[in-house]
Amino acid sequence: MNIEIKKQYDLVDYEASVKFMQLRVNEISNNLQKELIWFLSHDHIYTKGTSANENEILKTNDIKIVKTNRGGKTTYHGPGQRIVYFMIDLNSKKKDIRKFITVIEQSLIDFLKNYKINATTFKDRVGIWVTGKDGQTFDKEEKIGAIGLRLQKWITYLSLIHISEPTRPY
């Protein structure tokens, strides 16, 4: 099957998106739907992955906090940030979660190169980090994206790359 690409420009409710992904994963596993890459943004929300700690949120500013079953720590989502959810059937590919994550990370790094933005990953840190722009190296790296992952029957969902912007309400 070909992979469907879905782009949404309005804000999508986080919990509604999770329900949609769970349904889509079931449909993919039963060969009723294509794999999907979904581009969207959420309203202000914190999502807590399976490795989250209570002290990760400095202040909530009345922003909703939702516990998820994806991997990772606490993540802020909000307007202006692009999120990409991958609903990909790894049964039809190599069942290698690390490789899947590496391919997504490298895709973002390669994309940023087109805009003369240097980015990389670090073995001791989670995420994709911007190290410089237009040939200049930054004094401190800035995180631009991270991946949280969940598998159901070897189909990914809640696997996101979270494209950050500097303005965050925390």
For every predicted segment, state its role:
Residues 1-141, 151:
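N-terminal lobe of the biotin/lipoate ligase/transferase fold
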Residues 145:
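A translation/RNA-centric and nucleic-acid-associated enzymatic feature enriched
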Residues 148, 154:
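Active-site cofactor/co-catalyst pockets and adjacent glycine-rich loops in catalytic enzymes
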Residues 155-161:
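Conserved phosphate/anionic-ligand binding catalytic regions in large, soluble enzymes, centered on
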Residues 161-165, 169-170:
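Single conserved hydrophobic/aromatic residue that forms the stacking wall/gate
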